[in-house]
């Protein structure tokens, strides 16, 4: 399992929790952006066998992301999720969450 976190303090805390739960051998936390070339190099190194087999980094079964900000789009993380899908997700992989609903209402202020 791989986690990619942009904020160093959050990544550090995640590593502490992972270590405390004795899962360091299963979960690796990287600091950075999913789109960065240096992350691609780290993933190729980490998943060398899978990369050699299919010559692709599309080795992940699930991409899980907290991509929605308030009003769904404020943090603009959707392009990062799309990048992860296009570059790392297996053909039959899942993106979680995989849907969202946005409800809108028109309000008018009328003076009488």
Where in this protein do the model-derived segments appear?
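Class I SAM-binding transferase module
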Residues: 1-112
């Amino acid at each position: 399992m791989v986690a990619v976190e942009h904020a160093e303090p959050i990544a550090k805390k995640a590593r502490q929790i992972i270590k405390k739960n004795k899962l360091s051998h299963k979960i690796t936390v990287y600091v950075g952006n999913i789109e960065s070339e240096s992350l691609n190099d780290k993933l190729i190194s980490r998943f060398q066998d899978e990369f050699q087999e299919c010559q692709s980094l599309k080795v992940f079964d699930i991409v899980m992301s907290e991509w929605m900000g308030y009003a769904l789009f404020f943090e603009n993380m959707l392009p990062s999720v799309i990048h992860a899908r296009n570059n790392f997700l297996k053909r039959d992989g899942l993106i979680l969450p995989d849907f969202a609903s946005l409800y809108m209402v028109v309000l008018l202020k009328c003076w009488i």
